Amino acid sequence: LRALFIARAYEPAVFGDANAFFHSLNTDEAFLRRTLLRGFLFLALLRDKEYFDVDDLVLIRENMPGMFFSAGEQPFMIGGSWFSPVLGKAQSAFRFSVFPLPVTSQGAVTVLGLDTPLSVSSRGEHVPQAVQLVEGLTSPENILIFNDGQGGFSLLKNAPLPADKAVHPLWKSMDAGRGIFHSDIRLRYNLWHRLDSGIELILSGASAEEATESVIQALHDAQQGKEGKQGKQS
């Protein structure tokens, strides 16, 4: 649901001036509130039209994602591309493809993530060995292995497409410029991880306005906590 939210809320960045969009998110709270509201209005609409069932979402959290889809009980599922190789191995006779999210009037959007960080502590006891490990993990051949296992796309130049052909439609979307990072580095705060309170409210039947205010408050609380830590350190 967070990916659906981002695809709809960030539509102006995907099809317009992304730099101006993120600058406004960082500096104009009224613009931020309108952006959040656009995303939550979309989720509330999907909920009210029963495009997703709240009880089923609870079951998905507690069980294997995709079980209803692969069993033929649902015509489609919404999930990360990382699940495509898993589903393909679990149901070898099941045929499917992974497509961008069709959530805007201007076209479908692929929501991207960069969430596999590797780092080495300069204060560690075995820095040379740790550096060697990271160098090995980030070699082109190992990046290819990792991406194939995750249904992901390599950041390396001239890298081949993933071995999992089911996710190839996503590349066409990205190649056409219809992709957006859910945690864009131009944002000065981590909006992606502050959406949960608003989404939980949507699932409980609350309004898009209530969900928006919940996330605004979560962002304020996070900022105050950050400033408090900086004050103690100084």
Predicted feature residues:
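Beta->alpha turn/N-cap motifs
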Residues: 62, 79-85, 116
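Extracytoplasmic/periplasmic substrate-recognition and gating elements
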Residues: 88-153, 197-201
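Glycine-centered hinge/linker elements that transmit conformational signals in sensory
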Residues: 19-58
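Non-transmembrane alpha-helical segments in soluble domains
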Residues: 40-48, 66, 70, 131-138, ...
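Short helix-initiation/N-cap motifs at beta->coil->alpha
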Residues: 55-70
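Paired acidic/hydrophobic, glycine-rich loop segments that form the ligand-binding mouth/hinge
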Residues: 75-80, 97
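Extracytoplasmic/periplasmic solute-binding protein
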Residues: 1-28, 74
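Long, aromatic- and glycine/proline-rich binding clefts that accommodate carbohydrate-like moieties
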Residues: 92, 147-201, 229-234
